[in-house]
UniProtKB/Swiss-Prot annotation:
The active site is at residues 40, 43. It is found in: Cytoplasm. This is L-threonine 3-dehydrogenase. The lineage of its organism: Bacteria, Pseudomonadati, Pseudomonadota, Gammaproteobacteria, Enterobacterales. Pfam families: ADH_N, ADH_zinc_N. Zn(2+) 2 binds at residues 93, 96, 99, 107. Its EC number is 1.1.1.103. Pathway: Amino-acid degradation; L-threonine degradation via oxydo-reductase pathway; glycine from L-threonine: step 1/2. Its cofactor is Zn(2+). SUPFAM superfamilies: GroES-like (SSF50129), NAD(P)-binding Rossmann-fold domains (SSF51735).
Length: 341
């Protein structure tokens, strides 16, 4: 079958032929319709330090997808041939304390689809049936293909009560923009997003944020004054991994504020801990999606009117995958979807 693989320990990704994956007793096989390019896939393409430590070569990559069930393992119940599915990309062990306690997103033995085992940039993907999620009929293939990153946004945004709250989102990448849209949809008062990438900030404006602030040109304190805010933000979502953005977020939080962190800062990042301690801030780390509460919320949010379509900015047939990666690497894109149909 055709697949996009990391074939060499250098920059790039290559189309190749690989054997079709084998089906286990508890697995389903999915014929891929559409895939989306994740920031992780760009790291793998660039062959950065994290990729060099993590990714075995050769390896089929990709973990954002939608497809159709074409084969079912003999022990599988609840799925039928022809079901349209996406899937949770974190495969968990089922026997550690967190798995047995129902907190599977915190499994210490997590294996990543397209990171530690063959991924979805292929004609066929095999995953445990436990990880598959049926897509409702009124959700398009394109939106279903971005459920994985949308889930990161939903998990982060819904970490805290948002109704009537003022929210600051640092980092206007696709996940940050989707998180901001979720906050607005569920009843936050002001949702402000910051970045230095004007293309992405324009995208955030299309998604309905209160203010999209280019911090290289505009002062966040002035924006808060303009919005009539006198005490700082109630909720902060750190989506950038950039130390200056996180420090600015800490400075802008109200006392007792709550922060969810999805962005991954450098391990040696320094901050003013007085901002955390004397403000009584609560900081929560976010990894992946809650299984499967986040997935049900994703579907419900779209079905209740949340419009994510502006975040998908580029579409290519799979044979033009290089253009898709070029768009993602340029910084002038939202989500990029590749069609395998």
């Amino acid at each position: 079958m055709k697949a996009l693989s990391k074939l060499k320990a250098e920059e790039g990704i290559w189309m190749t032929d690989v054997p079709q994956p084998e089906l286990g007793h508890n697995d389903i096989m999915i014929k891929i319709r559409k895939t989306a390019i994740c920031g992780t896939d760009v790291h793998i393409y660039n062959w950065d330090e994290w990729s060099q430590k993590t990714i075995p070569v050769p390896m089929v990559v990709g973990h954002e997808y939608v497809g159709e069930v074409v084969a079912i393992g003999q022990e599988v119940k609840g799925f039928n041939i022809g079901d349209r599915v996406s899937g949770e990309g974190h495969i968990t062990c089922g026997h550690c304390r967190n798995c047995r306690g129902g907190r599977t997103h915190l499994c210490r033995n997590t294996v990543g689809v397209g990171v530690n085992r063959p991924g979805s940039f292929a004609e066929y993907l095999v995953i445990p049936a436990f990880n598959a999620f049926k897509i409702p009929d009124n959700i398009s293939d394109e939106l279903a293909a971005i459920f994985d990153p949308f889930g990161n946004a939903v998990h982060t945004a819904l970490s805290f009560d948002l109704v009537g709250e003022d929210v600051l989102v640092s980092g206007a990448g696709p996940i940050g923009i989707m998180a901001a849209a979720v906050c607005k949809h569920v009843g936050a008062r002001h949702v402000v997003i910051t970045d230095v990438n004007e293309y992405r900030l324009d995208l955030a404006r299309k998604m309905g944020v209160t203010r999209a602030v280019n911090v290289s040109k505009e002062n966040l304190n002035d924006v808060m004054t303009e919005l009539g805010m006198t005490e700082g933000f109630d909720v902060g979502l750190e989506m950038s991994g950039a130390p200056p953005a996180f420090r600015s977020l800490l400075n802008s939080m109200n006392h007792g504020g709550r922060i969810a962190m999805l962005g991954i800062p450098p391990s040696d990042m320094s901050i003013d801990w007085n901002q955390v301690i004397f403000k009584g801030l609560f900081i929560k780390g976010i990894y992946g999606r809650e299984m499967f509460e986040t997935w049900y919320k994703m579907a419900a949010l779209i079905q209740s009117g949340l419009d994510l379509t502006p975040i998908i900015t580029h579409r290519f047939p799979i044979d033009e995958f290089q253009q898709g990666f070029d768009a993602m690497r340029s910084g002038k894109s939202g989500k990029v979807v590749l069609s395998w149909d």
